[in-house]
């Protein structure tokens, strides 16, 4: 499994941040990550909040379980 780690950059990180930003407007417990394309501290905090909401380990990294939860939430709430 591929994991998005702190400092990673690129289109996939941008997409993750975009989806988290959309969710942050609907759920006050998910902070906006800012959409920069770099998995920085604010992005990690947003991922950790999503992980908490889905009862996943809160590490701020995006693995398959976190990705699947993000996609599910985004599809339901976009």
Model-found features: residue ranges?
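Cell-envelope/ECM-targeting effectors and their regulatory/trafficking segments
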Residues: 1-78
């Amino acid at each position: 499994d591929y994991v998005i780690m702190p400092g990673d950059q690129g289109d996939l990180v941008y997409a993750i941040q975009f989806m988290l930003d959309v969710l942050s407007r609907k759920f006050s417990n998910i902070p906006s990550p800012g959409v920069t394309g770099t998995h920085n501290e604010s992005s990690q905090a947003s991922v950790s909040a999503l992980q908490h909401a889905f009862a996943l380990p809160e590490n701020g990294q995006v693995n398959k379980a976190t990705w699947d939860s993000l996609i599910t939430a985004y599809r339901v709430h976009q």
